[in-house]
């Protein structure tokens, strides 16, 4: 009888130990072995390459480490003209990413080695800090020969001294680069080019590439002016539609007199010619009889 009791006690102890391990398991596991670590790294770890064009190294509020511009002293010119201005839509800590820039009088760009296949996103950061009207600086952006941004006019998009991000998703699989509905052979490097156009020089303020999708990209702060403009455009479209509807109804009313219903008219109008004819026939017959 003692053995069964001992066996029963051992089983209870094992059950208690198992329950304790289940409760403390998440705390005992190290970081990176949990569910989040298994699903994927955080935003800073997802960024495979980042550059503060025309500026020094910087770590933004999301933890992304932007390295110093590798083109310094090699290609184009660096400018910190934007340091004089506050940049809308950007946090105060990260305005430096939009206040410095690199531009060139000819097409220029960056080379980024990519070792692993998968989904990636190229994020380009811009701010117009010099020109105060549109059609003063317009250029294209190419990625491995594909035009991913056409006729970029920063001022026309967001106005002066305002942050603007261009977000370009892409995928690299089986030696092929897919972007903007086009496919090309991928040889291990991404070539990001800022193409000289007819209006001034191409430029960029900062840029980075992350492994992930557009949903992983931090969004800029809302632009009150742009939101108001969009709301006004929507209201104008609604008003125009309402006016068009009212005008259409009005035109339908004024399109002409309604056609009378012949079946609804009074039959007495048909008796008038008969009475006239009868009135003429009686006197004529009387005259003929007297003859």
UniProtKB/Swiss-Prot annotation:
It comes from the Eukaryota. The chain crosses the membrane at residues 269-289. A carbohydrate binds at residues 81, 103, 130-131, 200. GO terms for molecular function: carbohydrate binding; enzyme binding. One of its GO terms (biological process) is protein N-linked glycosylation. Interacts with the oligosaccharyltransferase (OST) complex. This is Malectin.
